Amino acid sequence: MLMAGQRGAWTMGDVVEKSLEGPLAPSTDEPSQKTGDLVEILNGEKVKFDDAGLSLILQNGLETLRMENALTDVILCVDIQEFSCHRVVLAAASNYFRAMFCNDLKEKYEKRIIIKGVDAETMHTLLDYTYTSKALITKQNVQRVLEAANLFQFLRMVDACASFLTEALNPENCVGILRLADTHSLDSLKKQVQSYIIQNFVQILNSEEFLDLPVDTLHHILKSDDLYVTEEAQVFETVMSWVRHKPSERLCLLPYVLENVRLPLLDPWYFVETVEADPLIRQCPEVFPLLQEARMYHLSGNEIISERTKPRMHEFQSEVFMIIGGCTKDERFVAEVTCLDPLRRSRLEVAKLPLTEHELESENKKWVEFACVTLKNEVYISGGKETQHDVWKYNSSINKWIQIEYLNIGRWRHKMVVLGGKVYVIGGFDGLQRINNVETYDPFHNCWSEAAPLLVHVSSFAATSHKKKLYVIGGGPNGKLATDKTQCYDPSTNKWSLKAAMPVEAKCINAVSFRDRIYVVGGAMRALYAYSPLEDSWCLVTQLSHERASCGIAPCNNRLYITGGRDEKNEVIATVLCWDPEAQKLTEECVLPRGVSHHGSVTIRKSYTHIRRIVPGAVSV
């Protein structure tokens, strides 16, 4: 059996009792509600009686009838056991039995029906669920219950078993669960298991079951940019081990799986001595074009660009947070973009902001009060006082800014947020008034469309996304006032709603989603606040020693970094603060070469093959 007897830590209990309809109220002879709660008065002459508790009474009554073998009209014979049931109940709960009893099949008229493909214990579990909405799922029975529920089309039970398996994933059982999901066409479970394998690739490589992965599944896993490996040689060796496991069957599949190994990124000596010298590689002429691409890349540097020359997210890279543009103490515009690497305690220089390196100073653009965000490791910037309609994206692999489609409505003092694979540009100021317009960018089609407008027109607010929703916090409804409102957008309904207000009214603030909370800092607050979307409540995280109006905040390496800003004397700040959620401690991380405010701050993974390290003395730590 898949789950029984396997090793590995469980992320949930070994036994879970699932109630798919919510908690059951206790059975009682007394009315569960006052009659007045169930009555809607209509015109004073008649009432509409809506008894929400009747469904529970019916369910309890049907279970009692089954236990008493009363009014049952069919017997299900499983192995040597017999189960007396009601056809109507089975048909209502299962599409399988609905088709059996509602169509002109022989079982429609038979008193006793032999059921195959399931054991008696599992059928007992499914029937208990049918009559009570409860089922006991354990690691010993989950596979059998899932297979039977899928056979008889108890779809909600299938979902419950899939959720149980998702929570129980570990390196020893994930390949088996993946095969189970594939066999029964459980696409959602399959995607989650594949994602788990991608994120835990190194730990799973030693599993014997890994060598039995179907070729298409292996191809999909190796193609992922998120494949967690420390070097590409691990991917190559995995492919060759998989082929050698059944060489007569799999040698012909080598070109198909090898195309997802990023051979150009292998060490040149390893490529020559290990890859090109491998006997199976030499026996397969179809892979020679892939070898030639790698040779050319090694000879010509980075001029050859393909999917195989793009580093994976976890190879040769470090997670860094960027400080983009901004203003200095004398209100001078900053064109530089700097990456700070907390782990290596160094500063890294990348391409300057676009349109800022013309020979004539008068031709250069000043990026003032723009917005920025990261999508798929590319940084998007938009708007600004002198660049109201401009939108650019920074490609970290080639260290260049690329212009994309203009905004429909120019703006500044706005925000950008990523949600559902799209970029949202929200609110802001158009030079005359605060606007409530929201635009959505589709990267695939390079086009903008309009989403539902904000409930409150604001600029200089904080915004971020969290679990399929977008949050706009605080901001200025005009030039003098600030608001404490929290506006929430649900893309599934294209509607905004108001949530719990922030503890203080604030503008010139920024927010970031981190773990299960949204953190907000800036303005005149002298504090870091956190909002819980699950509980719809706010709390104070920690006090700050100074105001940090128009500062930046970004998550990096499981910590939060607060950069720059302006204090209560309107002086720019050069320090970088670090909030450690584990230690619950705020510390000063480093000092920037110069103070900055109104800048952008985002996190990316940056390859060291595409950046120039600035001398260590440039940063005070």
Swiss-Prot record:
- Establish whether keyword Lipid biosynthesis is in the entry: no
Write out the GO biological process terms. B cell receptor signaling pathway; germinal center formation; proteasome-mediated ubiquitin-dependent protein catabolic process; response to bacterium
Q: What would be the name of the gene that encodes this protein?
A: KLHL6
Domain (BTB): give its ranges. Answer: 72-139
Annotated GO CC locations: Cul3-RING ubiquitin ligase complex; cytoplasm
> Where is it made, tissue-wise?
Found in germinal center B-cells.
Q: Which residue range or ranges hold the BACK domain?
A: 174-276
Q: What is this protein called?
A: Kelch-like protein 6
Organism, scientific name: Homo sapiens (Human)
Work out whether the entry's keyword set contains Hydrolase: no
**Where does the record place its Kelch repeats?**
320-367, 378-421, 422-468, 470-516, 517-558, 560-606
Q: One Pfam family from the UniProt entry?
A: Kelch_KLHDC2_KLHL20_DRC7
Q: Which InterPro entries match?
A: BACK, BTB-kelch_protein, BTB/POZ_dom, BTB_POZ_KLHL6, Kelch-typ_b-propeller, Kelch_1, SKP1/BTB/POZ_sf
